[in-house]
Amino acid sequence: MVASGIPALSLFLLMQGSVDGNGIQGFFYPWSCEGDVWDRESCGGQAAIENPNLCLRLRCCYRDGVCYHQRPDETMRRKHMWALGWTCGGLLFLISSICLFWWAKRRDMLHLPGFLKGKCDLSRTVSLLSKDRGTLSDKKTSAGSVPTSLPTEGNADVSGATEGEGTTEGGEETEGGEDED
């Protein structure tokens, strides 16, 4: 279980980091262009101001004709740490509960407590329900499931042969009706 959880978490961190282009460091220390432009330190000099592509290649921010350095984003960092903490905590809880149940099953400890053993007798409940269901089903078949108009024929086929097999319309047997060996 741990063997599958750690690579999954690593893959998540790797994918998150590759979105920013900063790698995993971008997950733990995210940078942002948010905030006031005028409080920031300029980036790339005059050439970056004149060429926005150069500014972005230097991994700086460009807004309103100003190229400036990014700042660490503390709110995003807190969100990332919160998500990482809950993911690791949930994974740890899942692994420990699986191990606990596995251990308890091996020790044959997964039984109902003594105070619940006598109170939950399902066999009696099921038998009572099945008796009630029998009378209910009899009522349903007599009322709803049998068609109201059945074709009545004078001679009913008692031998068990299907229609056209061994009998004629009048109920007489044909030559192929019985096998005589």
Curated annotation (Swiss-Prot):
Disulfide bonds listed in the record: C33-C61, C43-C60, C55-C67
Domain P-type: 31-71
Leader peptide range in chain numbering: 1-21
A cellular component annotation (GO) from this entry: inner acrosomal membrane
TM region(s), chain numbering: 82-102
Entry's localization field: Membrane
Residue ranges, compositional bias (Polar residues): 142-152
Record-linked Pfam families: TMEM190 (PF15431)
Gene Ontology molecular function: identical protein binding
Biased composition (Acidic residues): 170-181
Keywords of this entry: Disulfide bond, Membrane, Signal, Transmembrane, Transmembrane helix
Annotated spans, Disordered: 135-181
Membrane topology type: Single-pass type I membrane protein
Name this polypeptide is given: Transmembrane protein 190
